[in-house]
A protein has these predicted regions:
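Extended, histidine- and acidic-residue-enriched regions that form the cofactor-binding/catalytic faces
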Residues: 1-114, 118-211
Length: 211
């Protein structure tokens, strides 16, 4: 694979075949996220875009050893369905799709897969990794990208001291740095200290707000 490209969906079958035959590809990353409301100022693709951004940067650092599989852009978001535009899957459906993608990669000879998650609501998938490994016979792991940051780091660098929260300081800062075109401030009222534009009742409806 001499293209410098790590995103599977951008490659041709020849690119992938030659890289596999040469033994270049050692593993794959599967980004998982959501299409859901992120308050008034962040795009609905935020979680999926964040997971893809982290996955892409990691794979570039490891080129040509790692492929980025096609992202799962819809996740477990039932708790946000009252907000128009949100899409959701049942937990079993979400897990089944993730499993089938991992199995597809396995069938092509990839034996190490890292699921990089960008949506806290997808957390139940992490509890299925033992089952995935047993059934697939390969190494599969699940990590949410914000787990790379310690509590101490977050408290030092974030005014709110919270991560990932939901569409608050952490996610807004990530979007501003990675894809600023997805941040829309027009008409948005927020608390400058921590970008907390969410009411207490809004927080109460989010079961994963403080994860």
């Amino acid at each position: 694979m001499k293209t410098g490209e790590v995103r599977l969906w951008k490659l041709t079958r020849r690119h992938v075949r030659e890289a596999l035959e040469a033994g270049q590809i050692k593993g794959a990353i599967l980004p998982t996220g959501s299409t859901e409301q992120h308050n008034e100022h962040l795009a609905m693709e935020h979680d999926a875009a964040s997971a893809l951004h982290v996955s892409y940067q990691a794979a570039l650092e490891l080129y040509p050893q790692v492929l980025v599989a096609t992202p799962m852009n819809v996740g477990i978001s039932e708790h946000w369905m009252e907000f128009p535009g949100t899409l959701t899957l049942q937990a079993d459906t979400f897990a089944a799709v993730a499993y089938e993608i991992c199995d597809s990669l396995r069938r092509h000879g990839i034996e190490k897969i890292l699921i990089i998650n960008g949506h806290a609501g997808n957390g139940p998938l992490g509890q299925r990794m033992d089952d995935f490994r047993q059934r697939l016979g390969i190494e599969v792991r699940f990590h949410s990208y914000w787990e790379a940051y310690s509590k101490e780091y977050i408290q030092e660098h974030m005014e709110s001291g919270e991560a990932p929260a939901h569409a608050a300081e952490f996610e807004t800062a990530f979007a501003q740095a990675a894809f600023p075109e997805n941040v829309h401030w027009d008409g948005v009222d927020y608390e400058a200290a921590n970008l907390d534009i969410q009411s207490e009742s809004y927080r109460d409806r989010d079961p994963v707000y403080f994860r």
